[in-house]
Amino acid sequence: MWTRRAFKVALAGAVADVTLSARAAAVDAAVRPPARAGIEGQRRADLGDGRYLNPIVPGDHADPTILKDGADYYMTFSSFQACPGAVIWHSRDLVNWTPIGAALTRPIGTVWAMDLVKHAGRWFLYIPVLRDEGTGILVVHADDIRGPWSEPVDLRIPGCIDPGHVLGEDGRRYLFVNGGRRVRLADDGLATDGPVEQGAWTPWKYPADWVVEMFAPEGPKLLRRGEWFYLLSAVGGTAGPPTSHMVTLARSRSVHGPWEHCPHNPIVRTRSADEPWWSRGHASVVEGPAGDWWMVYHGYENGFRTLGRQALLEPVEWTADGWLRALGGTLDRPLAKPRGGQASPASRPLSDDFAHGPLGLQWSLHAAGADDAGRVRFEDGALVLKGKGRSLADCSPLACVVGDRRYEVTVELEIRGEGHGGLALFYDERGHAGIGFSTTQMLTYGYGQEHTWMREAMATRHVHIHLVNRDNVLTWRHSHDGGTTWTQHPWQMEVSGLHHNVFGGFTSLRVALFSAGAGEVRARNFTYKGLPA
């Protein structure tokens, strides 16, 4: 049954489709060069000719924090309600990235923009979280970047997010946080050494007539170069209008200030909705393999907010007067790769036969509870997902991030018990679309609810489901004879409105397997394929 909220969501998607797909088509025709297909047809940044085309990590990889350690680069991103979370990625050329492990293996809350640090031979990950009691910052540490990582330690600084670690000229460690604040750390980095200080830095303010989401000073990231400390931060809001987010720069000869703003602020900003990347911001700067300099940040792809904020790489240079200048323009075309890097495979296959464990790094449970790890096991050559909740909305589905504008997915499912399960595109509890099966019927989810009027009697335990997503239009098929013959679902869903500007949450529309009710679903042969634009 349609509700007022469901109608509004549907209308939002329809309006978005008319306006955004037109802009996206214009951008495709005008500036988007063809991407290079990588593993499984996924788009790949490395074009194979000495150039790359953004994004470097496609799909929902927001708030990048990056660290150079010799010839190696490591990066991680906000993981929100995903568990496992805080997946660490590795590269040797800044363009080709591979996931190597997860720093968080149990749910701790909603994980936002982190800071990855190496100090005195030990790795630290400072983690802002949102929990029932509010926001705060935790820290985990490890002697090896690949783990194991420690249990989280609460720094007990409520209301703080977006940590940026720096070692001051006084030899003390500090975390700069949102809102122009900072706190001194103990020498071991596992506790604070004093109160949160107000007014440690003053965010740069844009002109009043600029079209942004809100002021929202956040994401301080610091580095020391020569006699200067540099502080990058974001203002303008991370979503909202395409021209919202931006990168600003300040510097000081002391970690204690005073800080002076770059006369060329903002050094990165989306200035028009016609650009290929919207709301660019939340940057970190890193030295390249050959000594040149690069900036990583996130942005929404024009017309595809459903993919989330994707990781982007832009060359920068130091000016004669000691400021940073961005060199990539609107990122509308291929750029020369960093010099001197070692080519490495960019591989994150999403396909999974589920023949045995452990669970691949592409998978995570959404909004998992403390006991949800026990819902997933491997048995008889299948992944077994125990039912939870009553529907797709409240069952904590098993999801993976996708980064292609067009793709197809196929999975084989066996339904056991009194529940139901299936395949979905899942944003959150309020925004999702999918089809599911019990042993007696097929169920349809759209615009965040099950449409009972579309229930269809269907006695089966084994089903193959096939999903095609072409530019946010979904087509479903199902087969009950092992994939020999297929039946197309009567509803082709348009989902361009299932994103942060409608629902909040900052995440993306992910492919998900779900199991609801008093039963379990056995999954085999999950296959993913990116489709050409």
Give the location of each predicted region:
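Carbohydrate-active catalytic/glycan-binding domains of CAZyme proteins
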Residues: 1-2, 6-20, 25-533
